[in-house]
Amino acid sequence: MSPPRRVSFPPDTLQEDPPLADSPLSSPKLPEYDRQSSSTPIVSSNLPTDTTNSASAGPRRRQQPSRQVTLDASPPSATRRETTESARTQRSRAGSRRTSNSLDPNPGLMRRVTTVLFTPPKKIGKAPTYWGSMKAAITSTWLNVLLVFIPIGWALYLAKHNGGKDSISDTAVFCCTFIAIIPLAGLLGFATEEAALRLGQTLGGLLNATLGNAVELIVAILALIKCELQVVQSSLVGSILSNILLVLGMCFFAGGVRFAEQAIKSTAAQLNASLLLIAVIAVLIPSAFHFSISSSTSNTDASELANGEGADLLSMSHAVSILLLILYLGYLLFQMWTHATYYVDDAVTGSTQYPEAITNVSEKLKFRNFHRRKHDEEESYSTATTVSDAAVPPSARAEGGEVPATHGPGTAAAETGNRVEHEDAEEEEEEETPQMNVVCTIALMVIDTVLVGVTAEFLVDSINGMVESNPSLSAEWVGLILLPIVGNAAEHFTAVSVSVKDKLDLSISVAVGSSIQIALFVIPVIELLAWTIGKPMTLLFDPYESIVLFLSVLIVNQTLADGRSNWMEGMVLMMLYIIIAVSFWYYPGSTTATLLGCQDSSSVTG
C-alpha cells in the first residue's frame, strides 16, 4: 500500500475546444468532493508533463493550471484492516500457488488432473540419504520401542502351532500381536505422510484408506475361505463403525483441543457423507428384503431359505455388489478427475484459535489503555491532517505547485503493509523438507503393510482359543470391536496426527474415505469372491448391526453438515462408539448370516 498522495491530471486543452462528453472531470454528475478548489492543498507525485509543440499538433494551446483530485488517506484503523485482509489474501494465494494452474480449465483434462494429484502444496526440498531416511523412520516416534513385540508374538505363535507347545496360551499370542501392530501402524502413518508430501491431498487420502483397509481385506478373505461368514460380516461392519465414530471422533477431539473450531470443506464432506449413506443403504437392502418377507414367528430354516428366498438373496447380493463396484469407480472418477478441485487443500484453513484469557486486573488495564491509545492516535491523525493542509503556502495553491508528502500515521501503516508483503513473499518460497527419500518411503510402506498383514493373521488365529479360554468374551464382539480397532490402527494413527496439525480435511478423507472404500469396494469384492469360490455369502447382515450402522451414518451426516467441528462433537462420536461396544457385549448374536449354511452356493441357486 503506497503513501497517501494527491494525483495531478494533465492540463486541459484550448478553451475553444469543447470538453469531452464522457470526461469524468466535466461531467455534471461528478460529486462535489472530487472537484477541488484552488484553495485545496495539493500533494502530488511527479507526473511527466509534455510541454513540447509539434507541427501536427494544431494551433497553439494555452496552458491551464492542472486539475487536482485529492486521494485522501484512510485512518489508521482502516489501513490496518486493509493490511490484514491483504495479508490473508496473499497468504491464501501463496498456499494455493502450486495448484492454481490445475484449476485453469484451459489445459487439457489429463494435464489438469495430473497436476492436481501429483503436485505437492509446497515446494519440496532436498531428499535425505538412505541412512538419513532409515534414521528418521526409526526415530519418528517413541512407539517404535514396541517393535520388539513383533518377534515375540511370532515366536509364540509358531511355537504353539508348529512346535506343539500347548502350554503357550492363545491369550499371550493375542496380547503380543495386538501390541506389535501399534508401532507398525505408526510407521505406516509416517510413511504415508512422507508420500503425501509429494502427492496431492486427494491421492494421499486414497493411499491412506487403501493401506488401512489392507488388513480388513486379508482377514475377510482368510475368514471367507474358512467359511466363517459371521466373522466376515461383523469385521466389515465393525470397520465402518470404527472409522466413522471412533477414528473421526478422536480426530475432532484431538484437533478441538488445540483449536476452538476447525473448518471443514462442506462440499467434499457432504458429498462423502451422502455417498456413505447411499452405500450403506445399498448394502442393507438385502437385509430389508429378508425381514420384510419373513414370517413374524421366525421359523424359517435353512432348507426353506435354500428353496426360495435363499436363491433370491444370493442373486440380489451379486447384482448389488456389481452395482456398488460401478459406483466406486464413479466415485474415484469424480474425486480424482472431474471434480478433483473439490479436494484440493487450501493454505487458509479457517480454523479458530482459542482466545487468550484476560485473568488479572493489570492485563485488563493494559487492554483498556491499548484501546484508549488507539482512539487518541486516530484523533491525532485527523488533527495532523488538518494542520498540514493549513500549513501549505498560498503560493503553492495559486501556482498549482506540489508539496512533498510528509510522513504520518498513514505512511507508517503503508510501511507496515510493505513489511507484511515482504514476509508473505518469504513464506511463499518456504520449502517442505522431507525426512525420507522416495525409495525408502515406498520400501517402508510395502514392508510395513506385509508385517501388519502377517501379524494380524496371527492375531486372528489366536482369537478362537482366547474366546474358549475366556467365556465372558464372544467371537462376535471380538470381530465387531477388537478386530476393527486393530485393522484401523494405521489410518487411526495417521488421521489423529494430521488433525492436530490443522489438516482436518485429510483426516476426514482418511476416516470417511476408508468407510466408503469398505462399503463400495471391500464388501462387493468379498461378495464376488465368495460367488467365485462357491461360498454362500450374502449381504444379509445381522439386524441389530444393520440398525446401528444406519443410525451411526445419519449422526455423522449431521455432524458434518455445518462445515465446522470442535472437541465436543468428537466426544459425542466417541461416546456413541463406546455405547455400541457395551451393547454388543451383552448382545447374544444372530444366525442370519449362516442361514444358508456353508454349502456350495451352486446347490442353493441351482
From Swiss-Prot:
Residues 1-110, 376-434 are annotated as: Disordered. Keywords: Calcium, Calcium transport, Ion transport, Membrane, Transmembrane, Transmembrane helix, Transport, Vacuole. One of its GO terms (cellular component) is fungal-type vacuole membrane. Residues 18-30 have a biased composition (Low complexity). Residues 1-137, 192-204, 258-272, 335-437, 499-505, 557-566 are cytoplasmic. The keyword Repeat does not apply. The chain crosses the membrane at residues 138-158, 171-191, 205-225, 237-257, 273-293, 314-334, 438-458, 478-498, 506-526, 536-556, 567-587. GO terms for biological process: calcium ion import into vacuole; intracellular calcium ion homeostasis. Residues 159-170, 226-236, 294-313, 459-477, 527-535, 588-606 are vacuolar. Belongs to the Ca(2+):cation antiporter (CaCA) (TC 2.A.19) family. This is Vacuolar calcium ion transporter. It comes from Cryptococcus neoformans var. grubii serotype A (strain H99 / ATCC 208821 / CBS 10515 / FGSC 9487). The lineage of its organism: Eukaryota, Fungi, Dikarya, Basidiomycota, Agaricomycotina.
